[in-house]
Amino acid sequence: MSTQPERAGLEASRLITVLANELKPVPPPQELRFGQSMTDHMLFASYDPVNGWSAPEIKPYGPFTLEPNSSCFQYGTSAFEGMKAYVGPDGEPRLFRPEMNIARFARSAARMSLPPFNPDELLKLIKALVAVEKRWIPAGKGYSLYIRPMIVAIGLLTSNTALLWVMCAPTGPYLKGGSQALSLLAMRDTVRAWPGGTGEYKVACNYGPTINPVQAALDKGYDQTLWLLGDKITEAGVMNVFIVLKRDDGGIDLITPPLDGTILPGVTRDSILALAAAHPARMTLPGLAPTTLLHPSERTMTMTELQAWLAEGRLLEMFSVGTAVVVQPIGNIGYDGKDIALPTFEGGRGPVGQALYERLTDIQDGRFEWEGWSVRCED
């Protein structure tokens, strides 16, 4: 009785590296636009149900061929990630909390019934790719190498045949206005996610349907959408949302919607909550006095509450967070045919948002050591 050979896992030890014969010029930082200048190389691997994962390759970036009837085209069976590499003070590349991104990528792939992979092995492969593309990482605050892992199904119905690749692009500030406060259009009749859906996963089917309402917001002069679920505030565009409130005891509440299945569990979101909880007992956030007590929490927040907090003078700041924007202030919300003006500040961010931004970017760049969040990519 014959036995089938064991399917191969995704293994960094099998990595094959084929470098490009000619390297492209790296654009100067001031010319960088998000996702427009791809680096010289990409990481690539394929999966089939008989052999498992192929030997991963780092090879020149370029197009490849897919069958027209691939499941990813017809049913949107794909998942992706977004993470960044930075130049540390020692000139070496480093990643920010990459294990969280890879774990989320694995969860998203599993939700789409895509083939499993070993997260630790994929992280080793991404480190190897970043080391190869080191020259593409721009230096300076607000600059980084954006890393996009992708996994797509290429079978018909079941997602048992797949391609996985990772591509990179140098990037500067995500928004043209830098830290300028965003103006959002609250969407009541169109929802991004719903209970029992896929809102907590980074899968393609969550993003395509948002393009039309985002364009509608842009056409009306707003920068992005504020997604609602009934009266509940959920996300801003593709970003998590925070509100800063004055407490009766003189402290400050920092609140964000809970992870109820409709909210993407953002790495930046988690980091903001952790840093706020550490101030001032374990470390002091730059620009905030040690006597300023922050009380971070996850709780439902509604447009009705937001307007009441404004009327009471309790709402101090509102900002969005994400891998691309880091911390972006929100200064206006279009809602029910009127604009709701939020507190704005010279320079963009309010004191709490700015303090969290400064500390977070210092950790990302390796200028401030915290909890092992900044991970070096060894050559």
Stretches with model-predicted labels:
Residues 129-132, 140:
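Internal, well-ordered alpha/beta segment that forms a basic, Gly-enriched binding/recognition surface
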Residues 137-152:
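Extended, Lys/Arg-enriched charged tracts that mediate electrostatic binding to polyanionic substrates
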Residues 1-129, 153-379:
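Helix-start/capping segments and mature chain N-termini
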